[in-house]
């Protein structure tokens, strides 16, 4: 008879240890090892499994062929459909993560109602709330009349048996929402709910159901203090798409971001605004991020960025102030602090702008976060503008990457960035050298910049002209 062998599994990275330790050897986190049992001994190894079941041959098919069902389920919420690549793919599994209270359940409740209004069968299974609580949220959102089927259950076998039964004579579900994966448990694992083994086994069972039946499955995941989805990393590899629902506590907008998508582009974003009646779509996020600009204030530059296939204009704010400290302060919100240090070094080395006796504060307006290097030239322009006390032209946008030699390098999607700027009323742009060939015969002034020193000289000349 197989005996139970004790092992300790890290709840942060999933690493298996033979005995308990205060610190995980794989990820370095403290107090994350939890004792879990596993069957071992005679009759439990791979050889025993092979003796019980022999493999069967499966039919091989080609890439081309007929698709029985429509490939995607369109919700009608354009921002959600944009992020998923045009709708939920049948037979796919999506994982959505976000901070507590950010609006994950609100978003999925509205999506479930929108899909049910289009004639799809939607099943919403909650392991954290009672059915009455879900109904209260639906009433607050004004979608209580939608034909969404609800259940409060945490056992995976019971959930699959419920949505697979045809006692009611209804069709199979088109979309199944599980809120959340950390609350599920399966009879196939002996550990407690929320542990690595249970999360992995429960996710495997739900993904297997999606592939076998063709129903789309959405799994809600908790996040850790670092902003990563809690549980084993293997779950993110198993699912077809990973979405993060982001937002700052002091701002009313939310961003749904694609991190992984097997059926569409990654790095796409959908922007929503949180209101009393739920989440409202923001079709033009650039207007949201540029809503309250002070055009006469030095240290503000508008960056034309890209999020996936969507151009987004955001304001970068810089403040350079004299420092009384031996080591001046460098504070960054919404951008990479290491990249700011590089821009400051290039400005000092190649442009003669000295920041050694000044504190530098950099902020991306609206709580937005920028990760692409195309924002380098906008950051440099904001820093020089604040240092010199010269306001930048209010109808100008900036984009371009700065190298360590002080050269301005070209970036991708220049035309899309310029089109978005022109649509919002901007009339000029500081762009890398060579971008003018892509943008001709327009009532739009392009100032091509080959080196960062050229940009600094232009800003200084504009201030001298005003004096």
From Swiss-Prot:
A GO CC annotation recorded here is: cytosol
Per the record, what phenotype accompanies loss of this gene's function?
Answer: No alteration in UV resistance; does not replace RecA.
Q: Which GO terms describe its biological process?
A: recombinational repair
Pfam families membership? AAA_25 (PF13481), ChlI (PF13541), Zn_ribbon_LapB (PF18073)
Q: Where are the zinc fingers (C4-type)?
A: 10-27
Task: Name the UniProt key words of this record, in alphabetical order.
Answer: ATP-binding, DNA damage, DNA repair, DNA-binding, Hydrolase, Metal-binding, Nucleotide-binding, Stress response, Zinc, Zinc-finger
Q: Where is this motif: RadA KNRFG motif?
A: 260-264
Cited InterPro entries? AAA+_ATPase, DNA_repair_RadA, P-loop_NTPase, RecA_ATP-bd, Ribosomal_Su5_D2-typ_SF, Ribsml_uS5_D2-typ_fold_subgr, Rubredoxin_2
Please give the residue ranges the record annotates as the region Lon-protease-like: 359-467
- Residues that, per the record, bind ATP: 98-105
* A Gene Ontology molecular function term of the record: damaged DNA binding
EC number annotated for this UniProt entry: 3.6.4.-
Q: What Gene3D superfamilies does the record point to? A: 3.30.230.10, P-loop containing nucleotide triphosphate hydrolases
Stated family:
Belongs to the RecA family. RadA subfamily.
**What PANTHER family does the entry give?**
DNA REPAIR PROTEIN RADA, DNA REPAIR PROTEIN RADA-LIKE PROTEIN
**What the record says about its domains?**
Has a putative N-terminal zinc-finger, a middle region with homology to RecA with ATPase motifs including the RadA KNRFG motif, while the C-terminus is homologous to Lon protease.
Quote the function comment for this protein: DNA-dependent ATPase involved in processing of recombination intermediates, plays a role in repairing DNA breaks. Stimulates the branch migration of RecA-mediated strand transfer reactions, allowing the 3' invading strand to extend heteroduplex DNA faster. Binds ssDNA in the presence of ADP but not other nucleotides, has ATPase activity that is stimulated by ssDNA and various branched DNA structures, but inhibited by SSB. Does not have RecA's homology-searching function.
Protein name per UniProt: DNA repair protein RadA
Annotated source species: Brucella abortus (strain 2308)
**Its gene?**
radA
